């Protein structure tokens, strides 16, 4: 198969050199090779504007019809019940056939042949989304009336009306509200009068607005609601904070609840859904789980661990094996005797002395003792960790990786299993450093164990049936690769030293694929990428062959794209209980929530159409009823506390103060001269665009000017790669056009900013540029072109675009630019001078204080390295170009409190990533402002979070009389917008005008 383009960074999805681990045993093996990318494999991005469900930004009108053939089908409907229309092009009797299904997916009947002939063309060509409601469904034996509404793009309205007119149909007026007042009359049918339709413009909200709206859903949470506390199981060593005890109590009650899910009632022996008017005899399955959406840094991981150990079956804790005290002491002494650099072998051991053992003396594949497994010493609140030294031996054809020291704590013991340290040949790979990181998480695996496991693999199909019949035991945790090590750390840190867990890290080409053995574990930990890879390969995926006791999605917003294979792999898992852990359940828009609800198996929202019709569309169009439904739903299945939330009058998290200071910088005469020259030239050009009314069509040029001004504020050397703002002209030769477009794209890519793709509204991934000089993510624009064939148009300027004309920036050109910059003679700048003065002054007062130096420009961070070295500072760095292993090493090095450890971390704005904890720092120097104030706040939260004991002081360097001061004005405006409410946001035209006003403010026009 071919690998698919995805919106996360490409390196993250090329992690196919992986490892299999159970508890303490790592496995290094040959890497797999990457098949080539193919156009047809491109996954649509985050449910963007060209997907089926987003074709409904405008309501065209209504149409009356009839459903026939009722007596031939088992599906039934109630009065005023919503129904779905489904094309059936392969129907042997009518190629235009359109089925009518109820909410449960059961066929009720089909549309009359004449009506189907008119609608089939509209549905097949995605000109409109057609939705139905049956006003009088009960007691109809042969036929029933149907009220249909047509939603689509404004540009498709004429085609829809013409198609209906061709078959003798006309649309009637739209309902007065987003709901239906069916008693007030019908839509138009054949030969009826024509009406003008009101246009409901879709409302687009910013990320800040959405986060604020989500927080507002919980403002009226009562003290007696979700505030009961519960103590965790005895096996949990770390004391829980009050808000974590509340979360534990709520999660346990959700898992054990027998209540009906939201919007369901029992009426006359039938279970009735109040938002779709659907009813059925069988009780809908309750949601045994939910969304833990606490703010970042409030300890969601510890809470999840507590749930796993506290709530097994029938409200009882997970039965775990306990070691005797003399055994614990013996193992701890053994750990302390390890010497750095010694090559260890894992020796054969006798059976462990246990209390209350659950198992017979048969070989165990994953007996994990917490004190042998943890990478942290529990002797202090800031545990010291032994590093796993990984030796690289380079050769022309391969790379040998050898574990030179395996910490005793990571080894554990296998009964009756021999294991030894090995050298393993690994073939060439572009991601060998990430492989080494993966290998470093745990230790080497036993060859004997592999034989035991593979022996049982042949019985997979038989075992699959048995596992669905038995009560499940195992919790499956799925997380991004970047936090895999964090989960291992957390289990080691928070579980008592005498507790044994059957724990398996499912990762790597040698990972155990026998569902029978996996299902005997207490915990299986894997990544989204591994789950997706297995799901897409031939044959059964082992993880999909097991009915899990519980599935936990860490950073669960990773499944927000409903079209991605990753999301499909997650939704297809079988489990009794389901949890989503995320501090940002809404990333870009309200539609991000659907995948989470579908994962929770919340009926009827497992089918996306009902979510869209009853909640998503009404809310985004400002309907109060839709907002009330959303509030009711969210409060039922979600628990969210922010850092400012209070419990019994006290803040959830009592953190030290976090003052923010703005330090104004005055440019030198030379810097100011360059700044004014660039500003005057660009201002004249953009002023011409305003006069011509084409400013948005030249948005790339505007960004280019703003970028150059921001770069000058930091350092004039950053201007090396910038180009003039002249765009492609009609007289350019193909090669000249290509060069100009590549330069424009390099201009945007070199900014290091959070420039968004206009389609998916996220940071650019695999960026390409069109002939009209607009930059998009390649998967986004390719899917857009594919969906709008043969007349695809640019989403920004509506000019014609073609897939053959998309240009990518060749990597060698970017590398060449970096080389040119590195050869320049270093000079300082006003901002660097101010930073160095502050750092030296800070070192004089307290040499132990650690600082983050944050910038959007990675090249600027490189320039800052020179004076840091000259002044004798010990520093480390974290940016998006670093392999995951290097990132982890950098973080661990910075968090180290020993003498000689780095006191400064150079951090790129976009490199924060999920699960990043930088509490060692108590000073933050923001070298340049971000467009998005939320992006700044997220970086500040990396050190201002649970575990921070010192006051965090933030300094923002802002150049006086510059674009940076104007950016602060824009930030304040965005924060004010974020204070609004659902239904009061700007529509598309107002958003465009706001963008134009922003440009005027930034350029001082």
Swiss-Prot record:
The modification Phosphoserine is found at residues 395-396, 398. Residues 38-287 bind DNA. GO terms for biological process: chromatin organization; DNA repair; protein ubiquitination. A zinc finger (RING-type) spans 757-798. Its EC number is 2.3.2.27, 3.6.4.-. Residues 325-385 are annotated as: Disordered. One of its GO terms (molecular function) is zinc ion binding. Induction: Isoform RUSH 1-alpha expression is increased by progesterone and decreased by estradiol. Progesterone induction is increased in the presence of prolactin. Isoform RUSH 1-beta/RFBP expression is increased by estrogen and decreased by progesterone. Residues 325-361 have a biased composition (Basic and acidic residues). It is found in: Cytoplasm; Nucleus, Nucleolus; Nucleus, Nucleoplasm. This is Helicase-like transcription factor.
């Amino acid at each position: 198969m071919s690998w698919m383009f995805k919106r996360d960074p490409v390196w993250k999805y090329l992690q196919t050199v992986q490892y299999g681990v159970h508890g303490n045993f790592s496995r290094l093996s040959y890497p797999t090779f990457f098949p080539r990318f193919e156009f047809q494999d491109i996954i649509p991005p985050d449910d963007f504007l060209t997907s089926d469900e987003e074709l409904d930004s405008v309501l065209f009108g209504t149409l009356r019809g009839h459903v026939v053939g009722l007596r031939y089908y088992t599906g039934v409907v109630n009065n005023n019940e919503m129904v779905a229309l489904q094309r059936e092009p392969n129907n042997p009797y009518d190629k235009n056939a359109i089925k009518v299904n109820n909410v449960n997916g059961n066929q009720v009947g089909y549309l009359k042949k004449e009506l189907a002939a008119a609608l089939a063309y509209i549905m097949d060509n995605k000109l409109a989304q057609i939705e139905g409601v049956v006003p009088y469904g009960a007691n109809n034996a042969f036929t029933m009336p149907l009220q249909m509404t047509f939603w689509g793009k404004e540009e498709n309205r004429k085609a829809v009306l013409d198609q209906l007119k061709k078959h003798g149909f006309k649309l009637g007026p739209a309902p007065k509200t987003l709901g239906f007042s069916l008693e007030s009359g019908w839509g138009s049918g054949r030969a009826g009068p024509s009406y003008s339709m009101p246009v409901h413009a879709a409302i687009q909200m910013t990320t800040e607005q959405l986060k604020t709206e989500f927080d507002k859903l919980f403002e009226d949470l009562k003290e007696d609601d979700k505030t009961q506390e519960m103590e965790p199981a005895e096996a949990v060593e770390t004391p829980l904070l009050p808000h974590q005890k509340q979360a534990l109590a709520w999660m346990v009650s959700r898992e054990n609840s027998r209540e009906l899910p939201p919007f369901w009632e029992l009426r006359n022996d039938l279970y009735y859904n109040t938002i779709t008017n659907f009813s059925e005899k069988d009780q809908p399955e309750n949601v045994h789980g939910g969304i833990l959406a606490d703010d970042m840094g409030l300890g969601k991981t510890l809470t999840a661990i507590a749930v796993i150990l506290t709530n097994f079956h029938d409200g009882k804790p997970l039965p775990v094996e306990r070691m005797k005290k003399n055994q614990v002491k013996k193992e701890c002494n053994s750990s302390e005797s390890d010497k750095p650099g010694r090559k260890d072998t894992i020796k054969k051991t006798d059976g462990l002395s246990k209390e209350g053992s659950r198992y017979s003396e048969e070989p165990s594949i994953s007996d994990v003792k917490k004190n042998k497994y943890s990478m942290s010493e529990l002797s202090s609140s800031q545990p010291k960790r032994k590093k796993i030294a990984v030796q690289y031996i380079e050769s022309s054809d391969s790379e040998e990786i050898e574990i030179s020291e395996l910490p005793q704590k990571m080894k554990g013991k296998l009964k009756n299993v021999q294991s030894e340290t090995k050298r393993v040949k690994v073939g060439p790979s572009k991601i060998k450093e990430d492989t080494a990181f993966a290998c470093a998480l745990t230790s080497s695996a036993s060859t004997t164990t592999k034989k035991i496991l593979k022996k049982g693999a042949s019985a997979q199909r038989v075992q699959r049936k048995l596992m669905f019949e038995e009560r499940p035991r195992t919790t499956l945790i799925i997380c991004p690769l970047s936090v895999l090590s964090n989960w291992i750390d957390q289990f080691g840190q928070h579980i008592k030293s005498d507790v044994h867990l059957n724990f398996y890290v499912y990762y790597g080409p040698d990972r155990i694929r026998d569902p029978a053995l996996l299902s005997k574990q207490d915990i299986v930990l894997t990544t989204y990428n591994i789950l997706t890879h297995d799901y897409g390969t031939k044959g059964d995926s082992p993880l999909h062959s097991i009915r899990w006791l519980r599935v936990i999605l860490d950073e669960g917003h990773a499944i927000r794209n409903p079209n991605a294979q990753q999301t499909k792999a997650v939704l297809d898992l079988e489990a009794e209980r389901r949890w989503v852990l995320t501090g940002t359940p809404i990333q870009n828009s309200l539609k991000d929530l659907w995948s989470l609800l579908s994962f929770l198996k919340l009926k009827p929202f497992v089918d996306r159409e009902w979510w869209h019709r009853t909640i998503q569309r009404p809310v985004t169009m400002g309907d109060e009823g839709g907002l009330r439904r959303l509030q009711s739903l969210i409060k039922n299945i979600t628990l969210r506390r922010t850092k400012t939330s209070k419990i019994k009058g006290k803040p959830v998290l009592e953190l030290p103060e976090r003052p923010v200071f703005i330090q104004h910088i005055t440019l030198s005469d030379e810097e100011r001269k360059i700044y004014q020259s660039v500003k005057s030239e660009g201002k004249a050009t953009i002023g011409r665009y305003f006069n011509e009314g084409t400013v948005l069509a030249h948005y790339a040029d505007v960004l280019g000017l703003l970028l150059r001004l921001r770069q000058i504020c930091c350092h004039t050397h950053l201007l090396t790669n910038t180009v003039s703002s002249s765009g492609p002209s009609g007289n350019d030769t193909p090669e000249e056009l290509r060069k100009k477009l590549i330069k424009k794209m390099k201009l945007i890519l070199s900014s290091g900013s959070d420039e968004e793709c206009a389609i998916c509204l996220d940071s650019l991934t695999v960026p390409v540029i069109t002939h009209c000089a607009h930059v998009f993510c390649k998967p986004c624009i390719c899917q857009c072109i594919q969906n709008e064939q043969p007349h695809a148009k640019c989403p920004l300027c509506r000019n014609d675009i073609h897939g053959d004309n998309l240009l990518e920036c060749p990597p060698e050109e970017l590398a060449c630019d970096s080389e040119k910059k590195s050869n320049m003679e270093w000079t300082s700048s006003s901002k660097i001078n101010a930073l160095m003065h502050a750092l030296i002054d800070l070192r004089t007062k307290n040499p132990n204080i650690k600082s983050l130096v944050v910038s959007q420009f990675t090249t600027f961070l490189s320039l800052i390295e020179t004076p840091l070295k000259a002044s004798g500072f010990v520093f480390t760095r974290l940016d998006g170009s670093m392999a995951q292993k290097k990132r982890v090493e950098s973080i661990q090095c910075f968090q180290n409190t020993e003498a000689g450890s780095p006191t400064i971390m150079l951090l790129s704005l976009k490199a924060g990533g999920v699960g990043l904890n930088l509490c060692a720092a108590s000073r933050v120097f923001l070298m340049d402002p971000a467009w998005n104030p939320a992006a700044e706040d997220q970086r500040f939260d990396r050190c201002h979070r649970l575990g921070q004991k010192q006051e965090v002081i933030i300094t923002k360097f802002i150049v006086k009389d510059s674009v940076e001061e104007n950016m602060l004005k824009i930030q304040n405006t965005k924060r004010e917008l974020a204070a609004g409410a659902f239904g009061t946001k700007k529509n598309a035209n107002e958003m465009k005008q706001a963008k134009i006003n922003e440009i005027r403010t930034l350029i001082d026009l």
